[in-house]
């Protein structure tokens, strides 16, 4: 009866039992094989790419199995909570194509039958389970002060012992309920610890869905399950929440792998089945010749805001992350160039066991592939949405010429080898600025990129001759024939074999003449198809550009 008295003293207002909550949150009625997974961040900051990576794995595994993907907020450390972090999480995941079937929907809203989905609102649930453990003598109040714990830790380290509260060092583990009651009634502060049933001679062996079989010594620590503020520790909240929310698989960062013995032991003490576990590799990057963890402090690309500011389409980031999750995705994408990425089946056992390498060069390659497949109308919409927030001048210019810009975004896109000009929207300005006099006219002669074989004065002689022969109203073949005629008149070869045989007889190739025209119209040496650019610009604009070039 003493354990009962102790439990009632600590939790006088808790009248629910674990059985009540098991009935309230029954097993989910899902088809066989359907997985229930969650994204469970702490609202202590804004989202980073590692969070998107983890969330994408959970979302894909849930939805490709016909299961449930939910959002739980782990806000038991309320001192570190950042205002707006929850809304940022929801918005970020939505922007990256991940919507939650249930869970938190806003700072103060949620949906789903397994609510509440905020840990800070589940305090009575945790207390009911702790009260039950106290009744059974499986948990106890610990009155050790922070000073005592620090002194114990220093002593253990000095004696080369594992630090912590366990075995002979668990000072209050065997305190009688009567003595504990006296201390509580005297006003002493305490936390509640779970009595570890661990055996120092035994190991716990578990199957990790990424790493395979893992083995650890059994947990011996009497871990804290309720802190001094009455809220649970991460360990205990995880065990209760994932049990009651009927989570089937816990996918989390490998930094939690060392906690697995604690968590498996908690499920055992609670008398419930543990979920399956997978510990995903830490995202790494190359730093010189070595790898290191992607850093929030050192690496701007660790922040989700980086991808918005640079203008990566969300699909590009998703497809790149799928490449990291399963290297086979790249081959699948090559074989299924037009398929929706949702059609690809993520498989944990094919995931790299070591650190996932994050490579911006590879991301850019993936993003170019994604953008080049987009319809011009889609590119226009996505680009203007980005420019409205990050490049107001370009937004005003592009939206003032919507029809023209859709033509621009379609240049060289319909052939067997479509151009891949952009990896992200902040590259668009430099690639299309010459369609706008407002930007083009800011350039000087120093900005003009000529073919290496041409000086500016020779390029001007070419433009003087070509301007007279130029006819806007011709098809592409006729246009090129006219260009070649001008080239021949000026002493340029139109046959590469003849030029290579006797280069001294020519000033250069017809490509140099085309390069001069390109430079006059765009100031750039590398652009999409020149004829198409001229047709989009229109005759008046082309002739005006020739005039400006001759005046440089």
UniProtKB/Swiss-Prot annotation:
Enzyme class: ligase
Subcellular location: Cytoplasm
Cellular component GO terms, alphabetical: cytosol
Annotated motif 'KMSKS' region, positions: 293-297
EC number: 6.1.1.17
Residues involved in ATP binding: 296
Keyword Iron-sulfur: no
GO biological process, one term: glutamyl-tRNA aminoacylation
Residue interval(s) of motif 'HIGH' region: 41-51
The family this protein is said to belong to: Belongs to the class-I aminoacyl-tRNA synthetase family. Glutamate--tRNA ligase type 1 subfamily.
Its biological purpose: Catalyzes the attachment of glutamate to tRNA(Glu) in a two-step reaction: glutamate is first activated by ATP to form Glu-AMP and then transferred to the acceptor end of tRNA(Glu).
Oligomer status and interactors: Monomer.
Protein's recorded name: Glutamate--tRNA ligase
């Amino acid at each position: 009866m003493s354990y009962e008295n102790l439990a009632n003293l600590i939790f006088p207002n808790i009248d629910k039992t674990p059985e009540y909550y098991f009935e309230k949150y029954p097993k989910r009625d899902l088809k066989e094989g359907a997985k229930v997974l969650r994204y469970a961040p702490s609202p202590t900051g804004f989202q980073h790419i590692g969070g998107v990576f983890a969330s994408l794995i959970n979302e894909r595994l849930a939805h490709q199995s016909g299961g449930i993907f939910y959002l739980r907020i782990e806000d038991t450390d309320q001192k570190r909570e950042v205002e707006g972090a929850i809304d940022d999480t929801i918005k970020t995941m939505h922007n990256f194509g991940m919507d939650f079937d249930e869970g938190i929907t806003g700072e103060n809203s949620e949906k789903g039958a397994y609510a509440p989905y905020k840990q800070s609102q589940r305090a009575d649930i945790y207390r009911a389970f702790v009260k039950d453990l106290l009744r059974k003598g499986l948990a106890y109040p610990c009155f050790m002060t922070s000073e005592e714990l620090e002194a114990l830790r220093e002593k253990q380290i000095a004696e080369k012992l594992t630090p912590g509260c366990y075995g002979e060092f668990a000072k209050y583990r065997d305190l009688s309920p009567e003595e504990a009651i006296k201390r509580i009634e005297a006003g002493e502060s305490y936390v509640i610890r779970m009595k570890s049933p661990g055996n120092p001679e035994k190991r716990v062996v578990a199957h990790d869905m990424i790493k395979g079989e893992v083995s650890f010594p059994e947990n011996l620590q009497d871990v804290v399950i309720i802190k001094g503020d009455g809220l649970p520790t991460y360990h205990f909240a995880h065990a209760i929440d994932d049990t009651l929310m009927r989570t089937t698989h816990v996918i989390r960062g490998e930094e939690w792998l060392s906690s697995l013995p604690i968590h498996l032991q908690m499920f055992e003490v609670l008398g419930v089945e543990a979920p399956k576990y997978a510990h995903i590799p830490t995202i790494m990057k190359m730093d010189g010749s070595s790898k290191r963890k992607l850093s929030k402090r050192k690496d701007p690309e660790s922040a989700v805001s980086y991808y918005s500011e640079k203008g990566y389409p969300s699909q590009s980031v998703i497809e790149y992350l799928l490449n990291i999750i399963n290297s086979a995705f790249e081959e699948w994408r090559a074989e299924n160039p037009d398929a929706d990425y949702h059609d690809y089946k993520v498989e944990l056992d094919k995931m790299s066991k070591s650190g996932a390498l994050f490579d911006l060069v590879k991301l850019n390659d993936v993003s170019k592939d994604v953008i080049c497949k987009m319809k011009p109308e889609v590119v226009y919409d996505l680009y203007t949405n980005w420019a409205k927030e990050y490049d107001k001048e370009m937004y005003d210019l592009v939206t003032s010429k919507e029809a023209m810009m859709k033509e621009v975004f379609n240049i060289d896109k319909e052939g067997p080898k479509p151009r891949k000009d952009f990896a992200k929207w902040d590259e668009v300005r430099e690639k299309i600025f010459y369609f706008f006099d407002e930007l083009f006219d800011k350039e000087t002669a120093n900005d003009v990129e000529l073919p290496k074989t041409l000086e500016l004065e020779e390029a001007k002689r070419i433009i003087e001759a070509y301007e007279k022969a130029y006819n806007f109203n011709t098809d592409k073949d006729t246009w090129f024939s006219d260009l070649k005629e001008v080239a021949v008149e000026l002493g340029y070869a139109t046959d590469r074999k003849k030029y290579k045989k006797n280069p001294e007889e020519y000033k250069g190739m017809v490509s140099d003449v085309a390069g001069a025209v390109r430079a006059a119209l765009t100031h750039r040496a590398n652009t999409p198809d020149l004829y198409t650019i001229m047709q989009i610009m229109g005759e008046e604009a082309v002739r005006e550009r020739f005039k400006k070039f001759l005046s440089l």
